[in-house]
A protein has these predicted regions:
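S-adenosyl-L-methionine
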Residues: 49-75
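Conserved SAM-binding motif I beta-strand of class I
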Residues: 37-42
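Conserved alpha-helix/loop element of class I SAM-dependent methyltransferases that forms part
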Residues: 1-13
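Conserved SAM/SAH-binding beta-strand->alpha-helix loop
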Residues: 44-46
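Glycine-rich SAM-binding Motif I of class I
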Residues: 25, 29
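Class I S-adenosyl-L-methionine
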Residues: 3, 72-73, 89-204
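Conserved class I S-adenosyl-L-methionine
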Residues: 14-23
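Gly/Ala-rich phosphate-binding loop of Rossmann-like dinucleotide-binding domains
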Residues: 32-33
Length: 204
């Protein structure tokens, strides 16, 4: 639930949201309580059917459901796109196949955040801000992208840009340093050594 609340905090009351891979549409239900309209989309029909069950009258008013394997037709760039709970390459595939160029995208990918940042820039999306979320002892990286061009350092592409929770960022980085050092005790990997050096010398 921490992830949903964090995503919601980056969405203003006047936005409309498209949640691709909506699962149980919990984000849409959370937004509905604030009077925010959303489209809950998923590739699996049974997920949509289950998500529609036991909706309150308020939720029915603010949530539209659609079956789609990516960005559904009928949306435009003014809608805020949420891509959460999926891998980096799935996120990139969805965007590469989309006919819409969004003004704002919120992601929580499961892996390869450095690749996500670099590839999103190639697609014309730029990192606005980030936040580390800790949920059930796991760390998640929320990234907000927009279309305002910015330049980023090698360090920022690896660790992130404009982090909002430096305490959790430091905690996550220390976890990664310990994890990578255990690997380096068994094998000498130059790329991993460079990553550890960047993490160790990062200025919070």
């Amino acid at each position: 639930m921490n992830r949903l609340k964090c995503i919601s905090s980056y969405i203003s009351d006047n936005e409309k949201v498209l949640d691709v891979g909506c699962d149980q549409a919990l984000l849409s239900k959370l937004l509905a309580r604030r009077g925010v309209y959303s489209i809950a989309s998923d590739i699996k029909a049974n997920i949509i059917i289950n998500a529609k069950k036991n909706l309150s009258d308020l939720e029915k008013k603010y949530i539209t459901f659609t079956l789609s394997d990516g960005v559904p037709e009928g949306v435009d760039q003014t809608i805020t796109l949420v891509l959460s709970g999926m891998g980096t390459y799935t996120i990139l595939d969805i965007l590469k196949n989309s006919k819409v160029f969004f003004n704002k995208i919120i992601t929580i990918s499961n892996n390869n955040h450095d690749i996500l940042r670099s590839e999103m820039i190639k697609l014309g999306y730029y990192i606005k801000e980030e936040e580390i979320i800790k949920d059930k002892s796991k760390y998640y990286n929320l990234i907000v992208f927009d279309r305002i061009k910015r330049e980023y350092s090698k360090e920022e592409l690896l660790i992130g840009y404009n982090h909002k929770n430096k305490v959790l960022l430091k905690e996550k980085n220390e976890y990664l340093i310990n994890k990578y050092n255990k690997i380096l005790n068994k094998t000498n990997n130059e790329k991993l050594i460079n990553i550890v050096n960047i993490l160790v010398n990062y200025k919070y």
